């Protein structure tokens, strides 16, 4: 959970092409480093999945919709996409066939709660389908959750790469140095998730993973949130970064994060 939130916070000052900084030598935190919709939805999904452990798919989806709408309305103006922002305020919200990277940025809880890979994939699908029911939207969430689950259960980077390429058809052959020059702000899963996974695969530790993701440019907060979620599962998160993460949340969001830590453990 910390990985996605830290990626969001650290990447937030560099979002959009005019803010992109295509190098790794940037201040990890600055005055403009703040949480966005990525964090809000990550925590909403976490609460929904915790509240419905052991329940059926319909109950899980209902809880997802409730928590996402409730928390999203409590934190307006945090960078939600136009379609998603409309969904937040619908009385009877329905999925809208999105393949945006929002499904992947918020999926951490599915991989962290899952007892096996099959469950991680299933929970990821449920978290995506309430809004992002396009096959690419579901695939992005599942690929991220699978990489996370494999990382936290001892798989090597080579095994993670092989699994993601084989099962999801993502091309992970290009290096970050090859991606970086022409990469720009895009919000689709198919143009964000492979790049985020590549940033993790090339990293040397947790912080380097986030710096590498941000250095690619593009939708930097979401890209780093996806990379960070996988990097946390593989490396863990240094305590000083956890403390800084909590410091940059509101008391309500910090309480949700701490509740997740306590119950998920």
What does each model-found stretch correspond to?
Residues 1-265:
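Structured, active/binding-site neighborhoods that engage oxygen-rich ligands
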């Amino acid at each position: 959970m910390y990985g996605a939130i830290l990626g969001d916070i650290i990447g937030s000052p560099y979002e959009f092409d005019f803010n992109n900084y295509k190098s790794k030598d940037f201040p990890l935190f600055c005055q403009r480093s703040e949480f966005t919709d990525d964090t809000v939805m990550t925590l909403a999904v976490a609460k929904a999945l915790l509240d419905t452990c052991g329940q059926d798919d319909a109950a899980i989806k209902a809880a997802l919709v409730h928590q996402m709408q409730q928390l999203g309305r409590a934190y307006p103006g945090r960078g939600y996409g136009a379609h998603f922002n409309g969904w937040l305020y619908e009385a009877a919200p329905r999925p809208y066939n999105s393949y945006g990277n929002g499904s992947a940025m918020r999926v951490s809880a599915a991989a962290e709660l899952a007892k096996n890979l099959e469950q991680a994939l299933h929970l990821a699908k449920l978290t995506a389908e309430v809004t992002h029911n396009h096959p690419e939207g579901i695939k992005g969430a599942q690929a991220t959750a699978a990489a996370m689950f494999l990382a936290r259960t001892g798989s090597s980077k080579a095994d993670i790469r092989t699994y993601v390429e084989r099962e999801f058809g993502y091309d992970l052959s290009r290096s970050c140095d090859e991606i970086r020059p022409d990469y720009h702000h895009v919000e689709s899963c198919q143009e964000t998730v492979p790049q985020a996974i590549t940033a993790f695969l090339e990293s040397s530790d947790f912080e380097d993973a986030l710096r590498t993701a941000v250095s690619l440019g593009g939708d930097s907060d979401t890209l780093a949130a996806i990379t960070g979620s996988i990097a946390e599962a593989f490396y863990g998160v240094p305590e000083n970064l956890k403390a800084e993460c909590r410091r940059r949340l509101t008391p309500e969001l910090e309480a949700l994060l701490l509740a997740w830590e306590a119950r998920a453990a």
